Amino acid sequence: AQLFNVLKEAEAYPGPSLVIAYAPCINHGIKGGMTRTQTVGKQAVECGYWHLWHYNPQLEEQGKNPFVLDSKEPDWAKFRDFLLKEVRYTSLKAVSPEDAEALFQAAEQNARWRYEGYVRRSKIEY
C-alpha cells in the first residue's frame, strides 16, 4: 500500500519526482529464490534493513512536516537473521567470519542510526 500511495503522490507532484525502492535481485542470492521478493522486501522493512519514508514538499505549504516516516519501529532482533537469508552475506561469513561479524554489526549500527535520524526528522514541527 505504501508504494502505491507514494507513486500516486509522486505522479501528482508538479515537478520532478524520485522514487527509490528496495528491489531484491538475483545477485543477492535470496535463499528460496526470486519468487520470494515481496516477502524479502517486507522482512527488510520489519528488521530495519530498509526504511519506508516519503518527502512531499507540498505538505510544508499546508504547515505540515514534508518528511513522513512510514515504517514502524523495526524488530532489530531480526536484522542478523535477515542478512543470513542471502548468499552474499553467508558467503562472506564462510570465507571470513571475523570480518563478516564486524561488517554485520556495522550494518546494523548504520541502519539504527538512519532510522533514529528519520524519526527525529519526522518529528520536526512546521
Specify the residue positions occupied by each region the protein language model found.
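Metallocofactor- and cofactor-centric catalytic cores in central/energy metabolism, strongly enriched
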Residues: 6-10, 66-126
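Glycine-rich ThDP/TPP pyrophosphate-binding loop and its adjacent helix/strand module
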Residues: 1-73
